[in-house]
Amino acid sequence: GDEISVYAWTGDATAAPETRERVVNNAINKLTNGSWISTPQMLWKNNRDKHYFIGVYPISAISDLSAGEYTFDVTKQTESDLLVAINKDGLSYNVDEQQPVPLTFTHVMAKLVVNLTYKNQWGTEGPTVDKVAVGNAAKKATVNYLTKVVTPSAVASLCPDGNGFDIGQLF
């Protein structure tokens, strides 16, 4: 039941066009019985030009693939990883064969999980933890989906002592 957004265009591999000029614009591909089913159906522009593809998880309507806004959604923490796949070599359509589009996803932002465990040096109950501080935790960012570069635009508030971020503010 996973779903990804797929975008495709022709022309320059390093510059995705505006929404209206894309060959595929946010086609939602859902994993169904081991196959990806696209809505709407993805079609090739022609069989001459190379087509370039980007896949994004979770699904997202992105108007500017070189500067897309991303906001961490605290209500969907289990789906909070941001994965991106780019097919920058380009593919051309061949009418005589099935044409799968290889997309290998990598994390550009990931959920942080902190599990504190203690041995018995503080007794069976363990210590009381007031806070856990984490550095460089982004709540919002601008993502260049073409290069997978993430630029934080908002970070969690610093702890009062100025060291790291209060985990409670992130989740």
Residue ranges and their predicted role:
Residues 142-171:
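Intrinsically disordered, low-complexity terminal/linker regions enriched in Pro/Ser/Gly
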Residues 134, 139-140, 144:
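Acidic/histidine-enriched alpha-helical segments
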Residues 1-135, 157, 166-171:
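Short, low-hydrophobicity acidic/polar segments
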